[in-house]
């Protein structure tokens, strides 16, 4: 079968798409790749949360599927909204990479070594919230652009450190580009480290790609995405959520709050694996009972 894949044209997006292409070819399919820029790739002078709207890195890819020029799209799952246009669905969640965030620096080994007032680059309100809760003295600055341009800004001294997803660092072998790479103790974004395959809702396409699903990753990310969906939080909201499947139990921890780290709700819980389809909503409802929606509304007003 010939399968057409829509992809962003960044280095990381193409790595991800080529990875899926190779798996499809190994199953006997032929593959075409259609690359494009998304709104999130084009508008680089504005923090993502200020651009507003959901699907900043997915909408153009979705349009190409709805128009019939592509069958599937490969995404970083953390960028994928929790709702889909009619005719499209999240068809697969692939085996997950490292879910952690990481700090890269040319001078400092880890977050605690950073001097007072150090300039730290990240786009993510979730990362900003958690870092400032730990180190309120740091200067967190919005850092947009592709991975290579971010590392270039670190190397030329614009930043003392930058924060990226460890999965992307591993996939592109970026540790060799900088002196220090260290995982940081933040709760990741929903779906972080996993690739999500969005597809047109056609049986022959869905059947052809079903083998890409990884059960453990599906269980974990279903909880994470249901949690964020119940809170009505977009991909840019300051929400961290991580589910870990261990045997027949799932350990879940989550955090949300104000972007400056001054007010935070955090909790953890263990659910039976069999409850994974309701656990995310139930966990979110507990946060809502503690005022999570009001807190997120205030966080949105701070941006």
UniProtKB/Swiss-Prot annotation:
It catalyses: 4 porphobilinogen + H2O = hydroxymethylbilane + 4 NH4(+). CDD domains: PBP2_EcHMBS_like. One of its GO terms (cellular component) is cytoplasm. GO terms for molecular function: hydroxymethylbilane synthase activity. The keyword Transcription regulation does not apply. Its cofactor is dipyrromethane. Its EC number is 2.5.1.61. One of its GO terms (biological process) is protoporphyrinogen IX biosynthetic process. Keywords: Porphyrin biosynthesis, Transferase. Pathway: Porphyrin-containing compound metabolism; protoporphyrin-IX biosynthesis; coproporphyrinogen-III from 5-aminolevulinate: step 2/4. It holds the Pfam family Porphobil_deamC. The modification S-(dipyrrolylmethanemethyl)cysteine is found at residue 235. InterPro entries: HemC, Porphobilin_deaminase_cofac_BS, Porphobilin_deaminase_N, Porphobilinogen_deaminase_C, Porphobilinogen_deaminase_C_sf. It comes from the Bacteria. The porphobilinogen subunits are added to the dipyrromethane group. PANTHER family: PORPHOBILINOGEN DEAMINASE. Belongs to the HMBS family. Tetrapolymerization of the monopyrrole PBG into the hydroxymethylbilane pre-uroporphyrinogen in several discrete steps. This is Porphobilinogen deaminase. It comes from Campylobacter fetus subsp. fetus (strain 82-40). The gene is hemC.
């Amino acid at each position: 079968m010939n399968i057409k894949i829509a992809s962003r044209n960044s280095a990381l997006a193409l790595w991800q798409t080529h990875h899926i292409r190779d798996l499809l070819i190994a199953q006997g399919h032929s593959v075409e790749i259609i690359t494009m820029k998304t709104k999130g790739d084009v508008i680089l002078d504005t923090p993502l949360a200020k651009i507003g709207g959901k699907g900043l890195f997915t909408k153009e890819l979705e349009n190409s599927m709805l128009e019939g020029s592509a069958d599937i799209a490969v995404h970083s799952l953390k960028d994928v909204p929790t709702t889909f246009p009619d005719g499209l669905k999240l068809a697969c969640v692939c085996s997950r990479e490292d879910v952690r965030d990481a700090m890269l620096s040319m001078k400092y080994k880890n977050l605690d070594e950073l001097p007072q007032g150090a300039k730290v680059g990240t786009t993510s309100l979730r990362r900003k919230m958690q870092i400032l809760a730990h180190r309120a003295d740091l200067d967190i600055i919005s850092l947009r652009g592709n991975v290579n341009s971010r590392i270039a800004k670190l190397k030329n001294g614009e930043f003392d450190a930058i924060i990226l997803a460890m999965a992307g660092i591993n996939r592109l072998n970026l540790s060799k580009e900088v002196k220090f790479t260290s995982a940081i103790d933040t709760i990741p974004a929903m779906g972080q480290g996993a690739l999500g395959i969005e597809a047109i809702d056609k049986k022959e396409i869905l059947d052809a790609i079903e083998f890409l699903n990884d059960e453990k990753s599906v269980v974990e990310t279903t909880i994470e995405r249901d949690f964020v969906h119940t809170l009505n939080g977009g991909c840019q909201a300051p929400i961290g959520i991580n589910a870990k499947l261990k045997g027949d139990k799932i350990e879940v921890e989550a955090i949300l709050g104000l972007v400056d780290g001054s007010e935070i709700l955090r909790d953890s819980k263990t659910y039976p694996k069999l409850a994974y389809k309701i656990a995310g909503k139930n966990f979110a409802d507990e946060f809502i009972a503690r005022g999570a929606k009001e807190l997120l509304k205030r966080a949105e007003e701070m941006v």
